Regions:
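Specific transmembrane alpha-helix
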Residues: 73-88, 128-142, 207-232, 282-302
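Long hydrophobic alpha-helical segments that form multi-pass transmembrane helix bundles
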Residues: 155-227
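Alpha-helical transmembrane segments of multi-pass integral membrane proteins
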Residues: 266-370
Length: 396
C-alpha cells in the first residue's frame, strides 16, 4: 500500500498535508472532549478533572500543552483553508465569484444544521454550529484583497486580546474555583438531555464565539490558503518552518502559566481566569503552527506508507468521523448509555478516546480501499448542490 505522493495528489485532487492534518485533528478533538464526561471526578484546572494518579497528571499536562485551545484553533484554520478551496473549486468550474461565495454560505448553513443534529439528537460536544456561523461571517472576505483580510484579522484579534482575559477572569470569579464541574450527571437520561439541548442549542455557537476566538483562526486559514501553503508546501518551506517554529514556541510558553496553577502556584480565581484567557489566545498561534507543521510533513513524504494513507483516508472523511467519534464518546462515557464516564479515570478516558480514533482510522481505510466516500460528506454535497449530478469526491 505505497503510492507516489504525486500520483495521490493528481488522482485524488487532494492536498496530502491538509488530509494528514484533518486526520490528526480528529485525535486531538476526541482527546479534548473525553474528560468532559468524567462527572464523578472533582474539577481540576478549567475543563480538566483533578488528577488521581501519575498517569492522570501526564494526561492533564499533555492536554494543557498540546490539546486544549489548540485543537479547536487547528480545526478553525483548516476550516478557513477549506472555504478558500471550495471557492476556487467553483470558480475553476466556470462559476462567477458571487455564485461561488453563495455556495460557501450554503455549505456553512448546512454545517450549522449538522451541528444542531449532533448537539440535540446525538448529544455530542458540538463545534460544527460555531464553525458554520464562522463560515457565514467570513464569507465576504473570500472576495477581498489581502490587505483587507489582514486589516480585518488585526482588528478582530486585538479586540479578543483585550477582552478574552477579562471575560475569563470574571467568569472564573463567578464560578469561584479553578475548574468547571462537568455538564453531565448520573441522573441524566437521553430524554432529559435532549429536551435541555433543544431549548439551549441556539446559545451554543454564540457562547463559543464569545468565549473563544474562532474567527481569527478561520481568517488565518484564509490567509495561508491564499499562499497555498498546504497545497504546495514544497514551494513554501521557508514560510512553513518560520510559522511552525515561532507558533509552537508561543503556544508552549503560553501554556506554562496554566500548567503551574494548582500545583506550584495558587493565584486568585480571577487571575487564573485571565491566565486561561492567555492560554486561549496563544492557542490561536498554536493551531496555526499545527496546520503548517503538517505542510512540512507533507512536503517531506516521498512515498506514502500504510499509516500515512490511512490517516489521509480519515482526513478525507473528517466530517463523518468527527460526528461518529462524538457519538461514540456519548455512547461509551455518558450516563445515557454505558456510563463509563462515572467510573473510569482520566487516563482510562484518554485510552478510550484513542481507541475510538483508531477505530475511525480502520473504518476510513476500509472505505478508501472500497472507494467509498464518507456518508456525511455525500449528504453535505447533495444538499449543497441540490441533488444535481456532481463529481464524486471524498472530503468536504
Amino acid at each position: 500500500m505505497s503510492k507516489s505522493i504525486n500520483n495521490v495528489t493528481i488522482e485524488k485532487k487532494r492536498a496530502v498535508s491538509l488530509d494528514l492534518a484533518r486526520g490528526t485533528m480528529l485525535l486531538l478533538i476526541v482527546l479534548a472532549h473525553a474528560p468532559l464526561y468524567l462527572y464523578a471526578a472533582d474539577p481540576g484546572i478549567m475543563h480538566r478533572v483533578e488528577s488521581g494518579s501519575f498517569f492522570d497528571q501526564i494526561v492533564n499536562l499533555f492536554g494543557i500543552f498540546i490539546i486544549d485551545n489548540r485543537a479547536r484553533a487547528m480545526f478553525a484554520v483548516l476550516l478557513g483553508y477549506g472555504l478558500v478551496l471550495a471557492l476556487e473549486g467553483q470558480i475553476s468550474k466556470g462559476k462567477n465569484e458571487n455564485h461561488a461565495v453563495k455556495i460557501v454560505r450554503r455549505r456553512s448553513w448546512y454545517l450549522i444544521l449538522f451541528g444542531v443534529v449532533l448537539a440535540v439528537l446525538i448529544g455530542g460536544q458540538d463545534i460544527l454550529m460555531a464553525y458554520g456561523v464562522a463560515g457565514l461571517l467570513v464569507s465576504p472576505l473570500l472576495k477581498c484583497k489581502m490587505k483587507t483580510l489582514i486589516r480585518t484579522f488585526t482588528i478582530i484579534t486585538i479586540l479578543y486580546i483585550i477582552f478574552i482575559p477579562i471575560i475569563w477572569g470574571f467568569n472564573m470569579q463567578a464560578i469561584g474555583d479553578y475548574g468547571f464541574s462537568p455538564d453531565v450527571s448520573a441522573k441524566d437520561t437521553y430524554l432529559s438531555t435532549t429536551m435541555l439541548r433543544l431549548l439551549f442549542f441556539p446559545v451554543i455557537p454564540v457562547l463559543i464565539h464569545f468565549m473563544f476566538p474562532i474567527l481569527p483562526s478561520v481568517i488565518l486559514g484564509l490567509w495561508i490558503a491564499r499562499y497555498q501553503l498546504l497545497i504546495k508546501p514544497e514551494q513554501n518551506l521557508k514560510k512553513l518552518y518560520y510559522i511552525t517554529i515561532i507558533g509552537l514556541a508561543i503556544s508552549l510558553i503560553g501554556a506554562l502559566p496554566l500548567s503551574f496553577i494548582g500545583t506550584l502556584w495558587y493565584p486568585s480565581v480571577f487571575t487564573a481566569g485571565m491566565i486561561n484567557g492567555i492560554h486561549i489566545l496563544t492557542g490561536i498561534v498554536g493551531g496555526l503552527a499545527y496546520a503548517t507543521g503538517f505542510g512540512i510533513i507533507g512536503s517531506r513524504l516521498k512515498n506514502l506508507g500504510y499509516f500515512s494513507l490511512s490517516l489521509i483516508a480519515l482526513g478525507k472523511r473528517s466530517l463523518t468521523f468527527f460526528v461518529l467519534n462524538e457519538a461514540l464518546l456519548v455512547i461509551l462515557l455518558s450516563p445515557v448509555a454505558f456510563d463509563l464516564g462515572g467510573h473510569v479515570s482520566n487516563a482510562l478516558a484518554a485510552l478510550i478516546a484513542i481507541s475510538i480514533w483508531i477505530l475511525s482510522v480502520i473504518l476510513a481505510t476500509i472505505m478508501e480501499k472500497n472507494n467509498l466516500n464518507g456518508p456525511l460528506e455525500i449528504l453535505l454535497r447533495r444538499l449543497i448542490y441540490k441533488n444535481k449530478t456532481i463529481e464524486r469526491r471524498p472530503g468536504y
